[in-house]
């Protein structure tokens, strides 16, 4: 069985784990930069190694019988270029969002990316939007294959929309600017008087936690608003199941940072929760407006408020959205199908079928 070195930022229970450890027909080494990035002990095993402890890439590759390198961010692809040069192994690089922008990047990042495009064999952006971005930067189109992040459909079974009387709006994501939580809170404030029983729950932690709490006070959202900033990933399906509407108000951050396609959108669609999201980055690749959800302009409080009001008043449409959304996820975002596609890309690169 061919073995792949996967370099990731850290070891934690993200959506990257299946793309590292569950690719059919391929064994793995889970490489992180150094032990301090080993943050989730249950995921620690004998296949977790540290880049800082590899002094001779050639000896390491020969000892471990490695066939392929896979960096799970462009920045990590740059880190693996010297490794690739010494070992002559093919290099695959995933492109996930910020790495296809100049947001908070070091001086010379674009020059580094052009070198990566020249020397790397294969690039796997997580959506067509990012594929287009890196092509504009100079990545040859024949080196690009879109690989969507998949959803474990067993973990997120279809339940259908909640058609009872509750009006719970839920948003899940790190508390960073590009998630657009502040826009959602302002939109929710605009409709609150018309829907006194409606609630808004934001689930996630991050650098803007203090700002989000302050904004909730400023908007006088009171008990209609909850921020759950310390939630284990294992509890997310249960909390998502309490939603009547899932909202992903993503936007382009002031520093240029963008999304790919938020995994939480895929998870909500899989379970049959009506989804309201912005026309941002790769999101239109999973949601067709008025078919399997609703799309609004990004960073537009009034448009989002109108859409929230429409959704809350249109429960008769929810089941249609939910059924279409589940079909979309099953067809294009099933984790098992995407892992098979990843294996196919590896096979092609290594000269297989």
Short names for language-model regions:
Residues 213-234:
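Nucleotide-activated donor-binding/catalytic signature segment of Leloir-type glycosyltransferases, i.e.
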Residues 241-256, 273:
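Acidic donor-binding loop of glycosyltransferase active sites
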Residues 129, 150:
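Carbohydrate-associated surface elements
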Residues 104-107, 135, 141, 151-166:
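Acidic anion/phosphate-binding donor-loop and adjacent secondary structure
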